[in-house]
Amino acid sequence: MGKTLYQKIYDAHVVREVANETPIIYIDRHLVHEVTSPQAFDGLRTKGRAVRQPNKTFATMDHNVSTQTKDINACGDMARIQMQELMKNCQEFGVTLYDLNHPYQGIVHVMGPEQGLTLPGMTIVCGDSHTATHGAFGALAFGIGTSEVEHVLATQTLKQSRAKTLKIEVQGKTANGITAKDIVLAIIGKLGSAGGTGYIIEFTGEAIEALSMEGRMTLCNMAIEMGAKAGLVAPDETTFAYLKGRQFAPQAPLWDEAVAYWKTLKSDEDAIFDATVTINAAEIAPQVTWGTNPGQVIAIDQIVPRLNSFNDPVERASAEKALAYMGLTEGVNLTDITIDKVFIGSCTNSRIEDLRAAAKIAKGHKVASHVQAIVVPGSGPVKAQAEAEGLDKIFIEAGFEWRLPGCSMCLAMNNDRLNPGERCASTSNRNFEGRQGRGGRTHLVSPAMAAAAAIHGHFADIRTFATVS
């Protein structure tokens, strides 16, 4: 019997597997940030242990950093302490750190791939739930807790049970203007926020193969939002072209050897998945979440669901609670919903392709007078490239704020946050209650949709944006 891509990677990394015990797998790459690592390093220090493979461990600062200044004190005492601890720990244990003043500093799931730290066939972990992002390269990548962070630092291994496999095939081509964000939100809308629980998802199909690496990262980033452990896309020529020449990618003469191996990393034709879901790409429209989990999502040309449309009493109760929190009335057109803030950024949508898409919409327009709109590049290199292309000038002339790299308004752990009752069109990955600030109301959209909302002051369909403008 053939193997799935997940099974091939997992089997290649098993260190120990015996009956009645959880298998132990080897971890190729460990990414670290300031929030989930301090206690892990303290654990090593207390037990007199070293980092077993410091050359396979890389750290950056992202969650707590200010996007307006490089001052370590800007976001309060807790943020300062966590960043100072990360600097101390990385120096003591010999771990590479991209700190606030390093040109590579940025969101961990943006920094890793762009430096070539993320490679096909690897196992990658980080103390962050959106580590699944790296699965876009055909790597088995997933988030871990702080105690597991300590374990990987000490042993370069992790106990990990075998997971079920789910194949999601997006058949056909998407319409113009439909992005990876729309694809993944449509998938979550179909499966629900728990539809992938217990599975490793492999995304396949013509629409997936057509995505850039940035798009595939957006896709895999949100696999966790349907409950999955990880998301995978098999590596192909798009993957290899992205990786070639990057700092930590194999260099000649090892490059050809690496590519030959990477080409074997695909599910066999006779591989059996535990479940399969198919999506028609042509039916996917620009998506907007209306509720308080990513599964509460509809197309831009639809109305906010009526409560009597939910047959399941649990779903109906959830929808009723979500509508109350979001301050929405059932049956309202999405395009009639006004917004207060716009956030373009996060590990989901802060790469150069995302900024280009938003700038294309913003060019020649002005942000609505009542809207605050911020653009936060995902890393130093993304910021530098955007500025070299003049994207920063387009945003600034349109009335957007151009910021420094960081996680920013994705989560309320720094100075970028919503005030109670404020409504935000956000390119991030979670719209839970209070995610962007206590009482804040989050709607998840693509970068282009976020830019259009900023200009109109309400949600707008980018398919008719030129006409509306």
UniProtKB/Swiss-Prot annotation:
Pathway: Amino-acid biosynthesis; L-leucine biosynthesis; L-leucine from 3-methyl-2-oxobutanoate: step 2/4. One of its GO terms (molecular function) is metal ion binding. Disulfide bonds: none annotated. Belongs to the aconitase/IPM isomerase family. LeuC type 1 subfamily. The keyword Amino-acid biosynthesis applies. Its cofactor is [4Fe-4S] cluster. This is 3-isopropylmalate dehydratase large subunit. Its EC number is 4.2.1.33. Catalyzes the isomerization between 2-isopropylmalate and 3-isopropylmalate, via the formation of 2-isopropylmaleate. NCBIfam families: leuC, PRK05478.1, PRK12466.1. Pfam families: Aconitase (PF00330). [4Fe-4S] cluster binds at C347, C407, C410. InterPro entries: 3-IsopropMal_deHydase_lsu (IPR004430), Acnase/IPM_dHydase_lsu_aba_1/3 (IPR015931), Acoase/IPM_deHydtase_lsu_aba (IPR001030), Aconitase_4Fe-4S_BS (IPR018136), Aconitase_4Fe-4S_dom (IPR036008), IPM_dehydratase_rel_enz (IPR050067), IPMI_cat (IPR033941). GO terms for biological process: L-leucine biosynthetic process. Binds 1 [4Fe-4S] cluster per subunit. The keyword Amino-acid biosynthesis applies. Keywords: 4Fe-4S, Amino-acid biosynthesis, Branched-chain amino acid biosynthesis, Iron, Iron-sulfur, Leucine biosynthesis, Lyase, Metal-binding. Heterodimer of LeuC and LeuD. SUPFAM superfamilies: Aconitase iron-sulfur domain (SSF53732). It catalyses: (2R,3S)-3-isopropylmalate = (2S)-2-isopropylmalate.
